[in-house]
């Protein structure tokens, strides 16, 4: 479904050409002798602009002297694409949402040779694939009439930063429910030290205290337990809906909840992508509209597995195109995962009301706030306890909720030994409860251990992925040809570690994993869990609005998806009957192939 806006970010609109704000950035006294001046257009907020000024000034006084380049920065609030035809800048920031359509118009310079022959300190090694593949698209259409984007395509933009989705949660709400919050990476839960008794869950309940200082409280079943939320491990689907249930004020769920609803989650990507689903699936010739596909997905268990000339490794999720081959794979080499339909159904039930508005829609959980924007105000005002948002929410939260929120990763499909839930009576959501670690169910002690394949030891987990907004640096095709070498020298520096240290000061996740997953980046959060943002960015993907040359194909069905299906006014079957055929036709006519995308 389509992204509905960001509160603040490095964003390009399509509004007033040439509008400017916050002035030029010609700091540092002008170019020195031997420096060639280039123009750099970008968009930034007031606080971000100060950082951009510092970055440009640092380059001009340092690497720029060695390169013989002086950057004249210009903070423009909106840049119309027509401005790239006349009086174009030499370097420009472009978001993923605009990138492909502008690239197809021929508005960018192919940077492949620059990167191959003169990379400087910039290298794609150590940068997540989604960063680099997002801004690769061939200049020409192939002989089959399809233009390739992604892996192996022409480099038309260099990744400058990412703004990933994560969950922002209310500390007062969690305290009200007696939840103990820890921040321990999964690899550090090795059965030793302070958290030796803690299992790798995003949220779990324990019969006995799992660590010194943990406080107990009553759970939804009325039992005294130790509730533990680990903001460095994704919750699985059951944990997320249980926690959302805990924070939904209802006589059937929790009449004492401090919030009206549990969560505000507008995007379904984390559910679908975790099990290998998506709203599109490549069938070998074109794309299918696969948002409600009922075919099984597969997790690879064996060390390696060849499917249709593609090599998969243990822990990989099989692509849509290779699922049929996976179904016939040797016994024990794959593990069946939920279908894309299952993922969609779980997501829709979060916001669809119980009973589905008198049976018109899916019988939902009624635990999620239905909102198109999921504005930070819903967290601040006590409507929800968990908010799905890009890091742009931080600006609003720091203004009106400072010190009262923190950050956690998105959901992930994860399987635990003995399952995750039990029922007290009929198998309805009202009667569903999370299993308590240390309790006995059906004469079996529940340990809460992560499930793994018995033969291979492969953990039974899906992908950890959610969407991100990516920004690139490009050289406009119609810029001064004599200045393109100079423009490239600035780009390669800005995308290297030295330049990315400024990007991360704007809270955007830098392109290099070693820098993103570092104490230097975490420290920028001033105690908040910026690890979650960095972690999420490593496996993030572009949203469906940026898959192809424009988002029009999404507009054909997203209105019904968001306004009817998610709100509980139609079922998945009803949605597919009304919108599926048109969406399938629209996607089958797309002439771009996303190479390397799961």
Feature locations, PLM:
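Extracytoplasmic/periplasmic solute-binding protein
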Residues: 143-160, 165, 193-328
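A bilobed periplasmic-binding-protein/Venus flytrap-type ligand-binding module shared by bacterial periplasmic
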Residues: 168-171, 469-482, 502
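Periplasmic-binding protein-like
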Residues: 491-518
